[in-house]
Amino acid sequence: IEISKVDFEVLSLRAPSLHPNNTGRQWYGLYPPNWDEADYEVNQLLLSLRKLDTYNISLKKTILLGFSQGGAMAIDVGCQLDIGLIVSCSGYPHLNWKPDEKCPPILISHGLMDEVVPISASKNIYQNIKSISKNFCVLNKFEGYHQIDPNFIEYVKLKIEELF
């Protein structure tokens, strides 16, 4: 990603285990969802991110971005921290996720024809956050499936330049 006005570093956290069909990685078991494992991984990620200040990395200048299960993790973890921005692509709310009025700004994107994670999941996140948070929350719906919308990435780049 090329962003002209912002000086930044990328930290990419890798999910701890392989997806069962070897197409990627996962934070917790999916089939069926292992919510206890999800809660554990959320807590582990929170512990890790809270240590960023020891490396002179400000949470207020941190962006959490995730796709699918990673989008779910970004939403759950990000809403518990005072971070700069959450970006969720084709994500969904975790079973125990409860947003509050302190949720940071959130950008959500979801394909209208997604058969893996229904768009209703992102609509649910959007509606919950809009009902209680003063920060902005955007839901980008696009003609597509379980994928990342290239046009949305351009929008994210503009938002990053605006916010940071």
Report residues per predicted region.
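Serine-hydrolase catalytic machinery in alpha/beta-hydrolase-like enzymes
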Residues: 1-57
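Alpha/beta-hydrolase fold nucleophile elbow
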Residues: 56-66
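Short beta-strand immediately N-terminal to the catalytic nucleophile in serine-hydrolase-like folds
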Residues: 64-66, 89, 109
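Gly/Ala-rich beta-loop-alpha elbow adjacent to hydrolase catalytic centers
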Residues: 66-70, 74
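Active-site signature of alpha/beta-hydrolase-fold catalytic machinery across serine-
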Residues: 76-80
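A conserved short beta-strand
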Residues: 82-93
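Short beta-strand/loop motif that positions the catalytic acidic residue
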Residues: 107-110, 114
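C-terminal catalytic histidine-bearing segment of alpha/beta-hydrolase fold enzymes
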Residues: 120-126, 132-164
